[in-house]
């Protein structure tokens, strides 16, 4: 069984905890990680961008000038794409970009991402992550103790002091364990997890 050191917020070692091999020390399936990120990013897209083509743009029902005898190229409508004020040719239209991924594959992707960070020694476990007051300086001090910059902090319970202390720090995100996802794990590259959050993650992902 995989193990990991447990620290307090000053990076003093306070113990060792066992990790579920299936969740934190399993096979890293990069294709699943890629698929999960692709699905997440696609589902964020609103798909509402739209332009007017020549059928939609207002006006242009009349032929601008007669067919023959003017010496100019024949034209049927002043709202054709090559006219100023004309419709756009092949422009974007509203589209649904949503993709889906089954629950089993989605969980496997999160397990793979966590296993990847564990094997790269980018996973840190704290006994708890509580700040006595709202303090950005105090939060940054904790990150400096662990020599971390781009970091995802995963907690089990809502922690207002922690969330408000971290929200003005660049490249840091505080997330509840139940909202853990592949995109954030890969994006932030380092992850700090509380002991209780580890057990919550294992409970969700091992099933």
Swiss-Prot record:
Tagged with keyword Ribosomal protein: yes
Name of one Pfam family that matches: Ribosomal_L4
Gene Ontology, cellular component aspect: ribonucleoprotein complex; ribosome
Entries under InterPro entries matching the protein: Ribosomal_uL4 (IPR002136), Ribosomal_uL4-like (IPR013005), Ribosomal_uL4_dom_sf (IPR023574)
Keywords, in A-Z order: Ribonucleoprotein, Ribosomal protein, RNA-binding, rRNA-binding
Gene Ontology MF, one: structural constituent of ribosome
GO terms, biological process: translation
Coiled-coil spans in chain: none
Entry function: One of the primary rRNA binding proteins, this protein initially binds near the 5'-end of the 23S rRNA. It is important during the early stages of 50S assembly. It makes multiple contacts with different domains of the 23S rRNA in the assembled 50S subunit and ribosome. Forms part of the polypeptide exit tunnel.
Family: Belongs to the universal ribosomal protein uL4 family.
Quaternary organization: Part of the 50S ribosomal subunit.
HAMAP family (alphabetical): Ribosomal_uL4_B
Xref: NCBIfam families: rplD_bact
Name this protein carries in UniProt: Large ribosomal subunit protein uL4
Source species: Geobacter sulfurreducens (strain ATCC 51573 / DSM 12127 / PCA)
């Amino acid at each position: 069984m995989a193990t990991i050191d447990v620290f307090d917020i000053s990076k003093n070692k306070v113990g060792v905890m066992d990790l579920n091999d299936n969740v934190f020390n399993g096979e890293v399936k990069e294709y699943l990680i890629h698929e999960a990120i692709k699905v997440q990013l696609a589902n964020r897209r609103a798909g509402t961008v739209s332009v007017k083509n020549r059928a939609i743009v207002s006006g242009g029902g009349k032929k601008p000038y007669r067919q023959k005898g003017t010496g100019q190229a024949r034209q049927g409508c002043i709202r054709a794409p090559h006219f100023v004020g004309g419709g756009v040719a092949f422009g974007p239209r509203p589209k649904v970009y949503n993709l889906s991924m089954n629950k089993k594959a989605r969980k496997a992707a999160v397990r793979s991402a966590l296993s990847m960070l564990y094997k790269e020694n980018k996973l840190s476990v704290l006994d708890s992550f509580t700040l006595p007051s709202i303090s950005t300086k105090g939060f940054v001090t904790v990150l400096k103790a662990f020599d971390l910059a781009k970091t995802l902090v995963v907690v089990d319970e809502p922690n207002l002091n922690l969330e408000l202390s971290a929200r003005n720090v660049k490249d840091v995100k505080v997330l509840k364990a139940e909202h853990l996802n592949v995109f954030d794990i890969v994006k932030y590259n380092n992850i700090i997890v509380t002991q209780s959050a580890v057990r919550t993650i294992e409970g969700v992902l091992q099933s």
